[in-house]
Amino acid sequence: MITFTLCLLALIVGYFTYGRLMERVFGPDDRKTPALTKADGVDYIPLPTWKIFMIQFLNIAGLGPIFGAIMGAKFGSSSYLWIVLGSIFAGAVHDYFAGMLSLRHEGESLPEIIGRYLGLTTKQIMRGFTVILMILVGSVFVAGPAGLLAKLTPESLDATFWIIVVFAYYILATLLPVDKIIGKIYPLFAIALLFMAVGILVMLYVNHPALPELWDGLQNTNPEASELPIFPIMFVSIACGAISGFHATQSPLMARCMTSERHGRPVFYGAMITEGIVALIWAAAATYFFHENGMEESNASVIVDAITKEWLGTIGGVLAILGVIAAPITSGDTAFRSARLIVADFLGLEQKSMRRRLYICIPMFVAAIGLLLYSLRDANGFNMIWRCLLYTSP
């Protein structure tokens, strides 16, 4: 537990030290933000900072800091190091500058910012690349949550019903003003995920399980170590628990809602550090699980269910179900919303009117429905789309 505690403290100290240094490098000032200068009641809407933080945290987190950290824990104490060092020096820095550049440039989406610094050709490539990525993300995260919801209602509502419900929610979350659905639901889901993480953290110190220490060595403890080396597999497994390029596509959503550049460090850098803390907690909890039950289990959702029910009881089980269902849904809806904004930016279409939003959303959702039907009808369809997503993820 000593290494775990030191890593936890390092993440907190990193926010106040290295995060402040990065803030000085960027140099936020008192200029008016896009939420104030371009307010349109749809995407550019001033929101409270605490709510922006919660939305940003859930936007970038999803299932990554839970499932990824659990699988990464099989590699031993080196997973702790990657989560801590990656979050402080890579992930949070990336997220902060991605968000602040969008904030400084009128809330522009990722491809437009890239075009400012790398030229027109790169911008055009990133426009197509990023929109495809967002549609793939949204399409992938429909059937999974719907299947889990169907298991909760096996006698009354089947998977087809829940697929329709989830997709209908995606359409509404993409079209409606950001404060109508995302601004109301996301903070609640974020609080649930944080409450679950804090509960696990408390139980770690109550149970005080034997966790690997750095001085025991950084050897690969994965039972398939010969086939799954620490580099690159551990880094890929933990992924957004330390750094993810996907976050840069999400930050402009909140850059359009901030009322001060000085809120950037708590929102962008702070949300990534919080994700790192959540990932560290789950990596430690998974290490305990593997120590008690062996490493044969590879289904992260089973491990989450077992840990939360054992340590947090019925409430923990409910939170686990909520997290496993809500996290992918909140990744899917903001992916579609990001795609709409990216297309609107490069076509120069204002998004205040519903009609212009529909111009973009109708063909986008038609394409998504096609991908979804392909994944459902073809036994290998989902795997094919998932591999495409992995290949295109920045």
Predicted regions and their residues:
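Extracellular/periplasmic helix-exit of transmembrane alpha-helices
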Residues: 205-215, 269-306, 376-377
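Membrane-interface "cap" regions at the ends of multi-pass membrane proteins
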Residues: 10-66, 233, 260-263
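Conserved small/polar residues in nucleotide/adenosyl-binding loops
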Residues: 391-394
